[in-house]
Amino acid sequence: MNPRPVSRANDRLDCRGRPPVRGPGERDVLVVSYTRAAAAEVRERLAERLDESARALRGNVCTMHAKAYDLLNLSRDDVVGETDKQEFCEDFGIDYEDEYEGSRRRSARSTTMGNKVIATSQWLQRTRRDVSEWYDVPFKWDVEDVRLPPDVDPNAQTGNKYTPTWPSDDDRLDIPEAIRAWRAWKGKHGLVGFADMLERVEQRSLLPNVDYLVIDEFQDITTLQYDVYEEWRPHMERVLIAGDDDQVVYAWQGADPDLLLDEDVDEDVVLPNSYRLPSRILNVVNQEVSHIEKRQEKDLEPRKEGGTVEAVPRPSMLDLVRNVRSTVETDEEGTAMILFRARYQMFQFIDEFIGEGIPFRCLTDQRMWTDRLSQYVAAIETLAEDEPVTGLQARRLADMLADSAFGTGERDELFDVLDSREEEADVEDIAGMTVEPELIREHAPFVPDPRSAADMLRKVTNFQERSVDAYFAGDYQGMDRDRVRLGTIHSAKGREADHVFVATDLTEKVVEQIAATVEQEGREVPGVDTFTKHTDPVPTLTDNERRVFYVGMSRARERLVLLEDLVDGAPNLPIDVLLHNEPTDADLEELLAEAEQPLPAQ
């Protein structure tokens, strides 16, 4: 089943709601989602339809790695973590940068040698390649630091069979040796990575105890995951796979769209309509994705005629902030999504945007306007109106208020009172319980008013504190926290908004992968003598990167805004290259006017 973007989730839910769920029962079905966030969303929707709790469905709606974790009966201590990777790299003598250090830097973590070695090891496992094939990974390797394969390394020695491959003074890193050392280190310490889990499940033929298998986002599975799927498939009564080959965003992890395109199925259903995209936006994204060499052609009908596509050349972050603010104020019911290629770019925008006081959600796992923070803010607003707060909001106050708010008392005293009230109320969800403002002020006599709410916060990040301060000082109090969402393009998968802003800036890591792929394919890039990670502007895209931007652009229900050269210092992907795969030097307005027309029939 090869559905296209948009509301495929509802179509899949309808398919799931037929014989499997309403016949044998939901416990006989395993729904495999690619990410934890996607699994959580499916659980919520299914729970609502089945009148079941989402938590109860965790064993039946999860990622393949989560199911492998259960089948292998692992604990968290068995799984490789950031500190384990750091420790190995220190022992082996190579640099490593953890995800927290690298999240806000312009250069990517994967350009650090230890990160590249471990990522290469994982990529080889996911694509079922031997260690000797390490040079196939889409990375660029510096011959000054790394021994390349002897047939391409200028320092390799040739002669008779007794001639050593490398000179005795060659102290460059041997990548296969480092990969084998990493795998041996994991074994010595009794640790497994995500790829190791899937290998063990496949090798031991461990099967989920279900009769029906549903695999979502099938286009993003790796060869290793496909092997697990092949191990499970013969034991199922019925299998449903759903995916869109144009939406492969995890190719850098080994995802292979050909696994979807070449899969032999009994029934192949191509959904005919786009439930999200109006005609102009649909035509533009079709223009962008049409340059992919191998793909399944789709002839989609738009949700409606019209829609708006805008291109903004060389805006500043402040320009983008003003654009988003104007959007929020002009379309009072509309939703907005601002997407970047990397988290560090998103943080640059957040730094400028926080001062507006507009509440927002982060699609990534960053601690910003979380549910926890929103509940604290709602509690402060409610107390300011001298109205009762919910039991959940009261607990947030007890937990997040600074010690000074409790005067000579203790926060535990408020917790004790709330515990007693919950027992008396006998409610399953404390959000349904009310607590009068007098009780809160009795135990927290210095509970702040909105103006001081940020100053009296604890257990929050600097960004969160600044957000609360700006919110109560601004004009957007009471605004729905979900109206504005920020994230990376990857984190936006499966979501949508009325207004979508997509920054076309890339990262050195991405450009490095593009350059490596172009070199492997032997492609000529007009106007570029040497294509490296420092090439700017970027003159071409790979199919994999084109699919990523297709996902970002196809989130828009009403308006798509493309932002060219937004992020200072980031490699610039011009919009003409995005739409035509090469520089055209055409005027942006002319480019968009042409792209908004339907593609000629193939």
Q: Language-model segments: which ranges?
A:
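Conserved helicase motor core of SF1/SF2 NTP-dependent helicases
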Residues: R8, Y34-A37, Y212, Q219-G306, ...
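Conserved helicase/translocase motor-coupling segment
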Residues: R322-R485
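P-loop NTPase Walker
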Residues: M1-V79, N283-N286, S554
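A short helix->loop->beta-strand "cap" motif at the edges of active sites that frequently abuts
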Residues: A56, P234-R238, A556-E558
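C-terminal accessory regions
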Residues: R451-G487, K493-H499, T504-L599
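Accessory N-terminal region flanking or inserted into the helicase ATPase core
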Residues: M1-P5, R12, D28, Y100-V214, ...
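Helicase P-loop NTPase motor core of nucleic-acid translocases
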Residues: M1-L30, E41-R45, D171, D196-E199, ...
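Conserved two-lobed SF2 helicase motor
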Residues: V61-T63, G193-M197, D482-H490
